[in-house]
């Protein structure tokens, strides 16, 4: 399977870090390999 890239960006204080951590946690629970 090909690698997919997902970019989460925007101005400060909009929850980028929180969104990233929640997304990574959900993917890891589904036994997906993740790199941040």
UniProtKB/Swiss-Prot annotation:
InterPro entries linked to this entry: NifH/frxC (IPR000392), P-loop_NTPase (IPR027417)
Keyword terms: 4Fe-4S, ATP-binding, Iron, Iron-sulfur, Metal-binding, Nitrogen fixation, Nucleotide-binding, Oxidoreductase, Plasmid
PANTHER family per UniProt: LIGHT-INDEPENDENT PROTOCHLOROPHYLLIDE REDUCTASE IRON-SULFUR ATP-BINDING PROTEIN
Entry EC number(s): 1.18.6.1
Top-level taxon in the UniProt lineage: Bacteria
Cofactor(s) demanded: [4Fe-4S] cluster
Provenance organism: Enterobacter agglomerans
Residue numbers binding ATP: 10-17
Reactions performed catalytically: N2 + 8 reduced [2Fe-2S]-[ferredoxin] + 16 ATP + 16 H2O = H2 + 8 oxidized [2Fe-2S]-[ferredoxin] + 2 NH4(+) + 16 ADP + 16 phosphate + 6 H(+)
Functional summary from the UniProt entry: The key enzymatic reactions in nitrogen fixation are catalyzed by the nitrogenase complex, which has 2 components: the iron protein and the molybdenum-iron protein.
UniProt gene name: nifH
Protein name from the UniProt record: Nitrogenase iron protein
Pfam families: Fer4_NifH (PF00142)
């Amino acid at each position: 399977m090909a690698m997919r890239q997902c970019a989460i960006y925007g101005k400060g204080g909009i929850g980028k870090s929180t969104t990233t951590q929640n997304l990574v946690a959900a993917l890891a629970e589904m036994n997906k390999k993740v790199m941040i």
